[in-house]
Amino acid sequence: MVCPAKWKNLVLFAGSLAFYFYGVRKTPVYLILFLISLLLNWYLGAWMVQAADEKHRKQRLFAGVLFNLCPLMVFKYSGFFTGRGLLLPLGISFYTFQMIGWLVDLYRREIRVFPSFLHFGTWASMWPHMSSGPILRWKDTETDLGARRVTASDVEEGLRELTIGLAMKVLLANQLSGLWQKVGAIGYESISTPFAWLGLIAFTFQIYFDFYGYSLMAVGLGRLLGFHLPENFHYPYMACSMTEFWRRWHMTLGSWFRDYVYIPLGGSRCSRWKLLRNLLVVWLLTGIWHGAGWNFLLWGGCLFVMIAAEKFLYLKILNRYPWLGHLYMMILIPLSWLPFAVAEI
């Protein structure tokens, strides 16, 4: 806030790299991996923009997407097949999707002016969102990167969001997590049905306050730095259907899958069987993005079944009678988190 305007991006970039180094201090080689990712993605973007024709643009986009997915597959999913997981680099799931989105937006010519490496690096490494999102796109911060000024209202709003987010995490999420841990300590086969439901409801609110708290802190910190980061949650537990829920929960992830996977596959403007295929692909990918385990794959499959059933059978009824939708979601939301919460499958 007191830094001269011409130095703001350089100072933020250096500070973000220092933050990343602190986060991976036990395995500092991960900082080198992250720097390589920054450099090569910036170069890949320039390489693709300079392509002579559409065929070469597609080839270079494919190379860029493959380059970004390989480290994610090795670090996050190799343990799924070998049984021996690796320590994850900080934020790799988030910055991998951020980089892929950057390349696709360049390919689609949605980024009109190719940025300097300093602007790109500042955007890609911005420390408030690095560990838990939101997943940024270039358009989210393009204007702020070029010229930003922190006003009194920015400070007020940033501190408010930071405080609320911190309270959600410390006062609510951390306290609720203890109840679900007690369920696991007793053993799922030994607990009573009422206590199992109580534990599951506690987990339902714990994961909300935990993730929303982190996201709100990121938005607040971004505001204090002069950036207007996208909101990630919009009262998801007030949704009347699972379809609506996922438009309100982790919205930057949902919009990423919509724009870069679902719509390119054909979206909903296709035959019924292709629509089912598109939904299955998106929700299985959503599941395994959250973690490398059979429970996450099962969770993604359950979401597919729920949302496909709504689309083909009763979504119009839920939208017509909101009271019925709220009752339906009061039961379905805790049950939908069960495969996510129980890792031993």
Name each model feature, range by range:
Residues 1-345:
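Membrane-embedded transmembrane alpha-helical bundles that form the catalytic cores
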